[in-house]
Design a protein with these regions (language model features):
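Acidic, mature catalytic/reactive cores of soluble proteins
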Residues: 1-249
């Protein structure tokens, strides 16, 4: 659509100018607010690819520089959230370390995290999120508050559902991301921790399989709400055993 052409504007000066970016988006919105012209334009595939690649590279570098947080003890990870009041969620907040797994998974998987940053993230996750007896990597540290401006997770006690449980699909995606970036030992730790927890019937109280999550006492819950088993199989086959194509080949 002709209206979309403006979105392919490729200019580093624009990317660094918040006001100019908002003006461009407003102009695009105005052009298609009530109707679409129906006109089309041709953009060379190479030009579109270059524009999208430059946008992604700028964005990733921006995240590396502005969203990296540390605990003052040599550990670091990415802040992945802002609450509904526009406040940074992760880092050391009120002298309390706050870390969430999801932002680390996608920064690693997408290639945003550098190798040095991945090493720091895995070290931090082992320190703040890992709980061997209940399946491995929790979704988040305990915030010690009911933070209603961050979503449904605080509708649960710590260790249940999205609030600090070992959420299987995110733990498997963490493993998958680590394998993709060459951190096989760290990825295997995440996979084996889930497996060992699931097979420990005396604690998990489940038939063999991958539950949606393991709670604070290590019990596995809600197999029927997750697709984590398929992620697990995909990771074992394509990453652990390496049986996969390359970019569709």
């Amino acid at each position: 659509a002709e209206e979309m052409k403006i979105l392919f504007t490729d200019d580093n000066a624009l990317y660094n100018d918040i006001k100019a970016k908002n003006e461009l988006l407003e102009k695009y919105g105005e052009s298609c607010r009530h109707n679409i012209s129906g006109k089309t334009v041709k953009i060379p595939v190479t030009e579109a690819a270059k524009s999208l690649r430059n946008k992604s590279e700028w964005m990733m570098e921006h995240i590396r520089k502005t969203e990296w947080v540390t605990d003052g003890e040599g550990n670091g990870w990415f802040n992945g959230y802002y609450d509904n009041n526009g406040r940074q969620v992760e880092g050391v907040i009120d002298e309390q370390v706050r870390m969430m797994l999801t932002g680390e998974v996608f920064s690693i998987m997408a290639g945003t995290a550098t190798e040095d940053q991945i090493m720091a993230i895995t070290k931090s996750a082992d320190k703040y999120l890992y709980a061997k007896d209940i399946g491995g990597y929790r979704l988040n540290t305990d915030f010690h508050e009911i933070k209603t401006d961050l979503g449904r997770m605080f509708g649960f006690a710590y260790g249940e559902k999205e609030n600090g449980a070992v959420f299987s699909h995110m733990a498997v995606m963490y493993a998958n991301a680590l394998y993709k970036r060459g951190f096989a030992a760290e990825g295997y730790k995440a996979l084996s921790s889930l497996y060992n927890a699931a097979m420990n019937f005396e604690v998990s109280r489940i038939y063999p399989g991958i539950p949606e999550y393991f709670n604070a006492s290590g019990r596995g819950l809600y197999h029927y709400l997750t697709g984590a088993a398929s992620w697990y199989m995909l990771t074992v086959i394509t990453e652990v055993f390496g049986v996969r194509g390359e970019a569709g080949d």
